[in-house]
């Protein structure tokens, strides 16, 4: 099974507001950068969207080390939040509907093809790949504002 390292990040200009995401995929000496934007979204949705997009681009099942500076994204897997939400019919412990449920369900489906290790990195620090993802996300927002990226 191929081993792939992925870095992801999401950003929002206003929350909610125009948002972007970036991802860097590394396999051996190969590297791929992805990004996208939405006209009205939240930073949390962009964090999840980055992971979905990165995992979706993998053509076969892989062993993935996915790094994100989003505690929300990483802890949903590492702390068992997603499993608990599913068991509880997508309700929080306070019996409220889970936010971003559409994206969480999509991420679970896409991630199920792979062996994913969810890893937290410190945001806006000295990690060049995480910093690059942030640059990609912010550039996607800027491009959206210039109408260079069609919104989905």
Curated annotation (Swiss-Prot):
Give the top-level enzyme category.
hydrolase
Sites binding Mg(2+) 2 sit at 9, 134
Q: Which GO terms describe its cellular component?
A: cytoplasm
Q: What is its EC number?
A: 3.1.26.4
Keyword annotations from UniProtKB, A to Z: Cytoplasm, Endonuclease, Hydrolase, Magnesium, Metal-binding, Nuclease
Task: Outline the extent of the RNase H type-1 domain.
Answer: 1-142
Q: Which reaction does it catalyse?
A: Endonucleolytic cleavage to 5'-phosphomonoester
Give me the comment on cofactor binding.
Answer: Binds 1 Mg(2+) ion per subunit. May bind a second metal ion at a regulatory site, or after substrate binding.
Q: Which GO terms describe its molecular function?
A: magnesium ion binding; nucleic acid binding; RNA-DNA hybrid ribonuclease activity
Q: Which GO terms describe its biological process?
A: DNA replication, removal of RNA primer
Where does it primarily localize? Answer: cytoplasm
Pfam families in the record: RNase_H
Q: Where in the cell is it found?
A: Cytoplasm
Q: Which co-factor is required?
A: Mg(2+)
> Which residues are listed for Mg(2+) 1 binding in this entry?
9, 47, 69
- InterPro entries, A to Z: RNase_H (IPR050092), RNaseH-like_sf (IPR012337), RNaseH_domain (IPR002156), RNaseH_sf (IPR036397), RNaseHI (IPR022892)
Per UniProt, subunit arrangement is:
Monomer.
Q: What does this protein do?
A: Endonuclease that specifically degrades the RNA of RNA-DNA hybrids.
Q: Which family does it belong to?
A: Belongs to the RNase H family.
> What's the name of the protein?
Ribonuclease H
Q: Which organism is it from?
A: Moorella thermoacetica (strain ATCC 39073 / JCM 9320)
Tell me the gene name: rnhA
